[in-house]
Amino acid sequence: MTRLGFVLDSGSCIGCHACTVVCKSEHEVPLGVNRTWLKYVETGSHPQTDRHFSVMRCNHCEDAPCMSICPTNALFRADNGVVDFDDDNCIGCKSCMNACPYDALYIHPETMTAHKCNFCNHRVTEGLEPACVVVCPTQAIRVGDLDDPNSELAQLHASGEGLVRSPEQNTKPRVIY
């Protein structure tokens, strides 16, 4: 079995927004919404301040609350472990948006259906990497398979050194920082 996930290295991210731009282009994401976005984290106090960047997106959770609450099964787990969506089955009820602790879903303003990062599953199933991984100039975004003990993702997960967002939610995210 394959369980794909992301390693997001906030220390390497330079805040260039290449990932957000390529995602918008790859998926024709309209203005005003994003599948991937950057969070600016500023620390310290004047005059000694620092700014870090963190890539935010769907966490493709093992126990995805968006999937379990969806009344039409529009959100589903693909064979590679990715939480994907079927636009044709979505009724736009927003239950998934309310259930997601990571604020990763949005309603597409034209189709009025839920959308989110789908790991560029159309690319991955063809043996390609997600567009954000390809375009990142510092390799701050990497992919791996949690079921492959040799992958960086699996090793980071096993070591306990990687961090996940909101671990108290018990969703078992597949995005490790």
Model-identified regions with their sequence ranges:
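Non-ligating segments of multi-cofactor redox enzymes
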Residues: 1-177
